[in-house]
Amino acid sequence: MFKADLGRIGIQLHTTYSRRIRKVKVMDNRKEPPFFNEDNVGPFYFKLPFYDTMELFIETLTGTCFELRVSPFEAVISVKGKIQRLEGIPICQQHLIWNNMELEDDYCLNDYNISEGCTLKLVLAMRGGPISTRKVPVEDPLRELAEYMDSSRDEVWEKTSCNKQVTFLVYREGDQLNFFRVVDRGDGTLTPLSESLSGSVYNLYTDEDEEAEPSPSGQQIIENSITMNKMKLLKAKMENMNLSKKPKKVVKVKPRPPLAPRPTSSSTAAARHRLLRVLPHIGQSCLPSGNAHLPETSRNAGPSPAAQAPADRPVSSLRNELLKDDDNWEINMLSHSTSSIRLLPQLTHIELESDKELADSVLHLGSSLSRRTKHLSGNLLSNNEDDVVLFPRSEECVADELLLPEVGAFAPFAEGTGAEQSSGVEGLGKVTPEFPLTKGDGGLRAAEQPLSHVARVLSSEPGDNAVLNHREPSSHKNRLLSPLLCAAPVSLHNSLVKPQRQSKCFESGNPSASTSQNTLRELDIRTIADSSFSRTARFRGVKVDSPGKRSDIISKVEARDITEMANKASKEPVGCVNNNGFLASLARSASRDSLQSTHGACRLRSSGIGLSTNFQHFQDENIRKSSPQSEPTDFFLSARGIGMSGSNAAAGKRIGESIHHLPPVKAPLQTKKKIMKHCFLCGKKTGLATSFECRCGNNFCASHRYAEAHGCTYDYKSAGRRYLEEANPVVNAPKLPKI
């Protein structure tokens, strides 16, 4: 009966026997009363004396702690039985640990020197397998160590059978970690602590660090390169798709010109150059106000033209200082995009102060171009002086002769007395810095080239009804000009083709440089005249060079005005052109442009200018293809704006009988923009699925498509009545005779 009870509470027989032997030894020492073994079962019972008890604390891995009152001489198996009765945990799944040592069932608490108030660790070995030790809230190094120890479980499983329960214990003492394995033998007993594995946290990854990471094989390198190339191609394709759908919008800074003349120079110049620092894609350096922009200008210019004619200054010195800043900034912009610019020493009749006054007048006109785009136009010189014209383009070419000089752009701008109305010059200086002109990958050092944008205004009588009445070229007074110029028709002088009158045309630029694309913009109306025509020259072309402006952005009203202007230009003389509002609208359209096209900053489309070889072929083809009267109003639309030009001759040739020819229509560079539908009421964009046509003929969005939502003007009642009448015609049956 006693053995059955022992088996019921989970105490094995051999454990009971060993415990009996130990108790007998204690009895021999006479420290305890006699102990009767289980063999002497009889009616005699001995009452054990009462011993003092003590309280122990049992703590689980989950942090739960409870009290347990036990005797110091109580066996560990008895303590586990009490835990089973208290918590319901089977004895075979309990493991009590004290001082990093598991308590064996056969020994009592006194053998381990467990006293009052001690805390025992209770570890459970469940039938489903060991509890993961990572549930204990430990630091990251300990968690990584537990993962490392989990990987070594395979070796432990090989040593044990599959039907045994194994528990892994990890304890930390400072930086030292101890790893224990407890195996359930299957017969209710557990193995003692075995195969202890300990080590420091700091030398956990020493072996891993020593092992070099294996280098990828050649096949993997090839596959990686192929994948990388595919990703690059895909990225480029996606960028092209995005560019084709939505062109990048560049911030456009539209300056507001002042309404009154500027009284001082220091504050306004500083404000203007603060604006110039903000503008994108100009120079790399910020330009301070004052005369310190180009020190080489003052050193290399020699005697100043202003010093040669001090009595002819029309404006004050303060205004001149301000205009010097503008002039220096213009020349600096040109030097960034092309090459070094040098003013020829023969230009003796030019006044820098007057020229800078012209630059200031550009900023006074409301329809003027933006401050970022400056035109360098020169005054009319004497007949024996050489002319050098600068044409920034996509390619570099040097032509030999200039038959008809380019007429710079200026607009009618009445300020001062009529006696001051004369041809002007803007932004002339002598600059000789050298800077690299990069093309492709190699940097080319551009040599000093005598470059200047000289616009020549040929003489006309003051009585002409032109837009501007010009005085003689020898006048020193310069007119305040705006960026639009209409030149009076004049006859070509024979001295233009003399050797000493040969003009050099230097076209330079870099397609890859952004500064060359943002240098100049021109809005000009130029005339093409032959030597045989003195007063009967016609407008042969209207050219609006607005780089970066897409052709489809131009409003319909402006396009219609340009067409009408082109038709009138081929028929009327220059004196009849009085459409100043149209010219101002052209200037406004040009001032809105802030981008330069990739083809260069400005183009010269004058008739008698020798250009590069490919452009000469283009001129010859235009002359061959065009007929005398079939195309009087041909003009072309391009990404650079709306342009019309007369027929161009090859270099060194005069324009004779082909003055009435116009080039064929040039195809637009960009495809027509897809017209987006908008709601007639709210103006919201509507797509394919959100566009609704009403019976009133307008397009509406989803919320305004109903008749009551947009106040439809369609007469639904009369339409419905008419539909009912057509669907249900009135039938009059013959009357039946009465019987």
Curated annotation (Swiss-Prot):
Zn(2+) 1 binds at C679, C682, C701, H704. SUPFAM superfamilies: AN1-like Zinc finger, Ubiquitin-like. Residues 54-129 form the Ubiquitin-like domain. Pfam families: ubiquitin, zf-AN1. GO terms for molecular function: zinc ion binding. Keywords: Metal-binding, Zinc, Zinc-finger. Residues 246-255 have a biased composition (Basic residues). It comes from the Eukaryota. Disulfide bonds: none annotated. A zinc finger (AN1-type) spans 673-720. Zn(2+) 2 binds at C694, C696, H710, C712. SMART domains: UBQ, ZnF_AN1. Residues 246-270, 287-316 are annotated as: Disordered. PANTHER family: AN1-TYPE ZINC FINGER PROTEIN 4. This is AN1-type zinc finger protein 4. The gene is Zfand4.
